[in-house]
C-alpha cells in the first residue's frame, strides 16, 4: 500500500493532469489506484478535478470531501460561502479509508503545499505527515520555477516529508531557452519523474493513456506499491 500526496509550487501548475497521468500509468502497470481530493474550490464555474481524473485515467475509486463555489484559496472560499473547512481528522480518515494492500492512493492538494486545507491552519504537509506519505511535486518550466521548487522542497524537508520527485506539469513544444535550461536545473535539485506535454488534458482517453505510459519510468511506477 502506498499513499502519495501530489502538491505543486502553486495554483494552475498541472496537479490534476499529473494525478491523472500517474494514475493511468499505474493502472496500465496492473496497480489498483484511488484518487482523493479532499478540498475543491471553484465548483460554481464547473471545476471538478476528480471527474477530470476519472475521465482521463478511467479511475473509479474517487473520493472528495469539501466543495466550495468560488475559485479562491480554500479558507477564503469557505468563508465566502459561509461554510467551514473540514477538520484534520476528517481528511485523514478519508485517505485512510481508501488505503489498502496493493493500492496506490493519490491525494491531490489545493494550490501549493502550505495552503490551509483544514482547521485550524492544517496544510497538505501536515496531512502527509499524518498518513506517512511522500510528496510528488508538480512544477512549471517557467522563469521563477527554481526558487518556487526549492522553497517547496525545503518546506517538505522541514517536517521530514520525503520528496518522491518532480513532474513538469506542462512541457512546451518546442521548448524555449528558459524551459530547456530550467529542466536541466530542476533535475539537479531533485529527480524529474516526467514532463507532460502542454495540452495533455485535452487528449482523448486512448491518447492520454499512451502519453501517460510513455511519460513515467515503468520501473519507478511499478515500485510505488510494494
UniProtKB/Swiss-Prot annotation:
Main location, first listed in the record: cytoplasm
Known EC number: 6.3.3.3
Annotated residues for binding of substrate: 41
Binding of ATP, residues: 12-17, 49, 108-111, 169-170, 197-199
InterPro entries found in the cross-reference section: DTB_synth_BioD, P-loop_NTPase
Cellular localization per UniProt: Cytoplasm
GO aspect biological process, one term: biotin biosynthetic process
Binding of Mg(2+), residues: 16, 49, 108
Entry keywords, A to Z: ATP-binding, Biotin biosynthesis, Cytoplasm, Ligase, Magnesium, Metal-binding, Nucleotide-binding
Reactions that this protein is recorded to catalyse: (7R,8S)-7,8-diammoniononanoate + CO2 + ATP = (4R,5S)-dethiobiotin + ADP + phosphate + 3 H(+)
GO cellular component term of the entry, any: cytosol
Recorded superkingdom: Bacteria
Residues at the active site: 37
Family: Belongs to the dethiobiotin synthetase family.
UniProt function note: Catalyzes a mechanistically unusual reaction, the ATP-dependent insertion of CO2 between the N7 and N8 nitrogen atoms of 7,8-diaminopelargonic acid (DAPA, also called 7,8-diammoniononanoate) to form a ureido ring.
HAMAP family recorded: BioD (MF_00336)
Protein name per Swiss-Prot or TrEMBL: ATP-dependent dethiobiotin synthetase BioD
Lineage: Bacteria, Bacillati, Actinomycetota, Actinomycetes, Mycobacteriales
Gene that encodes the chain: bioD
Amino acid at each position: 500500500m502506498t499513499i502519495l500526496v501530489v502538491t505543486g509550487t502553486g495554483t494552475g501548475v498541472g496537479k490534476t493532469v499529473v494525478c491523472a497521468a500517474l494514475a493511468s500509468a499505474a493502472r496500465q502497470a496492473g496497480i489498483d489506484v484511488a484518487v482523493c481530493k479532499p478540498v475543491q474550490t471553484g465548483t460554481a464555474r464547473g471545476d471538478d478535478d476528480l471527474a477530470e481524473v476519472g475521465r482521463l485515467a478511467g479511475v473509479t475509486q474517487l473520493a472528495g470531501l469539501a466543495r466550495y463555489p468560488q475559485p479562491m484559496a480554500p479558507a477564503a472560499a469557505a468563508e465566502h460561502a459561509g461554510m467551514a473547512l473540514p477538520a484534520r481528522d476528517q481528511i485523514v480518515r478519508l485517505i485512510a479509508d481508501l488505503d489498502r494492500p496493493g493500492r496506490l492512493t493519490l491525494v491531490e492538494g489545493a494550490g501549493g503545499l502550505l495552503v490551509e486545507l483544514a482547521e485550524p491552519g492544517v496544510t497538505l504537509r501536515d496531512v502527509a505527515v499524518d498518513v506517512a506519505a511522500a510528496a510528488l511535486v508538480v512544477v512549471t518550466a517557467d522563469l521563477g520555477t527554481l526558487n518556487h521548487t526549492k522553497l517547496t522542497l525545503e518546506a517538505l524537508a522541514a517536517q521530514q516529508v520525503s520528496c518522491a520527485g518532480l513532474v513538469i506539469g506542462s512541457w512546451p513544444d518546442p521548448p524555449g531557452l528558459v524551459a530547456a535550461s530550467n529542466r536541466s536545473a530542476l533535475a539537479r535539485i531533485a529527480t524529474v519523474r516526467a514532463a507532460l506535454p502542454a495540452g495533455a488534458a485535452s487528449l482523448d482517453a486512448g491518447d492520454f493513456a499512451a502519453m501517460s505510459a510513455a511519460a513515467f519510468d515503468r520501473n519507478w511506477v511499478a515500485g510505488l506499491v510494494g
